UniProtKB/Swiss-Prot annotation:
The lineage of its organism: Eukaryota, Metazoa, Chordata, Craniata, Vertebrata. Plus end-directed microtubule-dependent motor required for normal brain development. May regulate microtubule dynamics during axonal growth. Required for normal progression through mitosis. Required for normal congress of chromosomes at the metaphase plate. Required for normal spindle dynamics during mitosis. Promotes spindle turnover. Implicated in formation of bipolar mitotic spindles. Has microtubule depolymerization activity. Residues 1-171 are annotated as: Globular. This is Kinesin-like protein KIF2A. GO terms for molecular function: ATP binding; ATP hydrolysis activity; microtubule binding; microtubule motor activity. The modification Phosphothreonine is found at residues 51, 70.
């Protein structure tokens, strides 16, 4: 039964009952007319003047020819030569139905569904052809043999949608008390040979994007794009001169205004810290003239020639020392070990540190070259010439012997070594512990500087203790250059570096606009008691600073890690004390030898005083026993501290569990 007539697509909808179920179907009119010729309506077709009149069954033939041409145009295929209909007077009308009978049946029996399927198939073929052309074009631009080819294509497509506005020398230099910037280095030869991918994008002068590869449960790979914002962002094409122009150069004038300036490079081993601070490397040889050390010295001597500073008669001195495993060594004095003490005025003094007077940039370059040749370094998986210590180069201005200003340029050790606190090698553990502690303390000191806090936890590490005067005072300025590696293999360390730098910069905003900000240095008495009970430490200045430092970084420092840091600090203090006492005993032993030699010479006399000899010898022996016993007890305590450090290193949890 026909239920409806669809004039739009020239079809009818029919329904029937089969086994008690109502079923329906859509049938086009052409199929109905071909199966039921008696239903074809009688229409008078006017003959065209250009074509001969149709044969007897004009309606049928016209429809057949029309439909056959329609099908041919859809398939874009010419009909067979034998089935062509020639519009000529010579064509025999009797052969027309025979030639088109097969096409008539096929064309009229195609439903709308079949036609739609054919259209979809045609579109699908066009789409596949376009995708194939696109793949061929991509294969010309990128290396399809790369194992991370899929990630590489996703990164390239994402970068294609960005609007690039990189930092240029024409951009203005903003005034910051704390300036944080990021520098990206290019891929090195090793990363290129390993076909590592560049996952760092710097689209503008203050934005850094990290394309972190991730994998879903079904093993589908995708990108997680993380964005960070800083004061300045330098891409891999920025030279040292450009980095210096926006970072350390604005700080040079600070030291002429009786201020303290600090510029330090922070990042993973091999990310370009020493290259930025010291200069270009050619193998193990370094061109010191292109580093921030030399560029800052050049501007210092240029400023000295200005009339308003020339009349001050300032003297320029320089020091260069390193901090390795909590110990300070003078790089300009054959790596002599130095002691860091605090005088009665609470001023930190580096005992024995040599200051060299410099008259020109060439003198500075010589000192840098001497210091770099002595600096502690080693070969790692990331870098063939890896720095394992914090190097501090200071340009000091003095007026008539008194301190006028100081510029501290610091090349920090690789931040990834801070994860080596659970290593089986004690020396590696000490390196990691000192780096970990000094970086946390350095961050908190900058936070205190940015918030104008009255207390700075500089005693928490040897690095911040030496740089105490750079974090105190209204005329103190700091610049941080976070260097990052672009390779996908370094993605985790790069994110850690950027998070550290981002946390430092967050603290420079107005605390009233920063939302919920907890006070970090002033705890009520009961809270101090709670902290002492929780961390189990006494009340010495160094331990208090270390305790508060760990409390402010509770998500990064577990109680076990704090215990380890405490054990390391105690062990280092005891080591210094034991070595100092041993040196004193050695000097005393020389005096004992002289006294004993005099006693023995006295016994060679004929009538020497036996009572005097015995009394003096007994006194010498008692003094020896007392001093050596005291030294032995300290050595035993020192060995116990070594055991405690080893036990504490085995119980470290990297992160403190969050409160539920």
């Amino acid at each position: 039964m026909v239920t409806s007539l669809n004039e739009d697509n020239e079809s009818v909808t029919v329904e029937w009952i089969e086994n008690g179920d109502t079923k329906g179907k859509e049938i086009d009119l052409e199929s109905i007319f071909s199966l039921n010729p008696d239903l074809v309506p009688d229409e008078d077709i006017e003959p065209s003047p250009e074509t001969p009149p149709p044969p007897t069954s004009s309606a049928k033939v016209n429809k057949i020819v029309k439909n056959r041409r329609t099908v041919a145009s859809i398939k874009n295929e010419p009909p067979p030569r034998d089935n062509r209909v020639v519009g000529s007077a010579r064509a025999r009308p009797s052969q027309l139905p025979e030639q088109s009978s097969s096409a008539q049946q096929n064309a009229r029996r195609k439903s709308n569904c079949v036609k739609e399927v054919e259209k979809l198939q045609e579109k699908r073929e066009k789409r596949r052809l376009q995708q194939q052309e696109l793949r061929e074009k991509r294969a010309q631009d990128v290396d399809a043999t790369n194992p991370n080819y899929e990630i590489m294509c996703m990164i390239r497509d994402f970068r294609g949608s960005l609007d690039y506005r990189p930092l240029t020398t024409a951009d203005p230099i903003d005034e910051h008390r704390i300036c944080v910037c990021v520098r990206k280095r290019p891929l090195n030869k090793k990363e290129t040979q390993m076909k590592d991918l560049d996952v760092i994008t710097i689209p503008s002068k203050d934005v850094v994007m990290v394309h972190e590869p991730k994998q879903k449960v079904d093993l589908t790979r995708y990108l997680e794009n993380q964005t960070f914002r800083f004061d300045y962002a330098f891409d891999d094409s920025a030279p040292n001169e450009m980095v210096y122009r926006f970072t350390a150069r604005p700080l040079v004038e600070t030291i002429f205004e009786r201020g303290m300036a600090t510029c330090f490079a922070y990042g993973q081993t091999g990310s370009g810290k020493t290259h930025t601070m010291g200069g270009d490397f050619s193998g193990k040889n370094q061109d010191c003239s292109k580093g921030i050390y030399a560029l800052a010295a050049r501007d210092v001597f240029l400023m000295l020639k200005k009339p308003n500073y020339k009349k001050l008669e300032l003297q320029v001195n320089a020091t260069f020392f390193e901090i390795y495993s909590g110990k300070v060594f003078d790089l300009l004095n054959r790596k002599t070990k130095l002691r860091v003490l605090e005088d009665g005025k609470q001023q930190v003094q580096v005992v024995g540190l040599q200051e060299r007077e410099v008259k020109c940039v060439e003198d500075v370059l010589k000192l840098i070259d001497i210091g770099n040749s002595c600096r502690t370094s080693g070969q790692t998986s990331a870098n063939a010439h890896s720095s394992r210590s914090h190097a501090v180069f200071q340009i000091i201005l003095r007026r008539k012997g008194k301190l006028h200003g100081k510029f501290s340029l610091i090349d920090l050790a690789g931040n990834e070594r801070g994860a080596d606190t659970s290593s089986a090698d004690r020396q590696t553990r000490l390196e990691g512990a000192e780096i970990n502690k000094s970086l946390l303390a350095h961050k908190e000191c900058i936070r205190a500087l940015g918030r104008n806090k009255p207390h700075t936890p500089f005693r928490a590490s040897k690095l911040t203790q030496v740089l105490r005067d750079s974090f105190i005072g209204e005329n103190s300025r700091t610049c941080m250059i976070a260097t990052i590696s672009p390779g996908m293999a370094s993605c985790e360390n790069t994110l850690n570096t950027l998070r550290y730098a981002n946390r430092v910069k967050e603290l420079t905003v107005d605390p009233t606009a920063a939302g919920d900000v907890r006070p970090i240095m002033h705890h009520p008495p009961n809270q101090i008691d709670d902290l002492e009970a929780q961390w189990g430490v006494g009340s010495s200045p160094q331990r208090d600073d270390l305790k508060l430092l760990c409390e402010q970084n509770e998500e990064e420092v577990s109680p076990q890690l704090f215990t380890f840091h405490e054990a390391v600090s105690q062990m280092v203090e005891m080591e210094e004390q034991v070595v100092e006492d041993h040196r004193a005993v050695f000097q005393e032993s020389i005096r004992w030898l002289e006294d004993e030699k005099a006693l023995l010479e006295m016994t060679e006399e004929v009538d020497y005083d036996v009572d005097s000899y015995a009394t003096q010898l007994e006194a010498i022996l008692e003094q020896k026993i007392d001093i050596l016993t005291e030294l032995r007890d300290k050595v035993k305590s020192f060995r116990a501290a070594l055991q405690e450090e080893e036990q504490a290193s085995k119980q470290i949890n990297p992160k403190r569990p969050r409160a539920l």
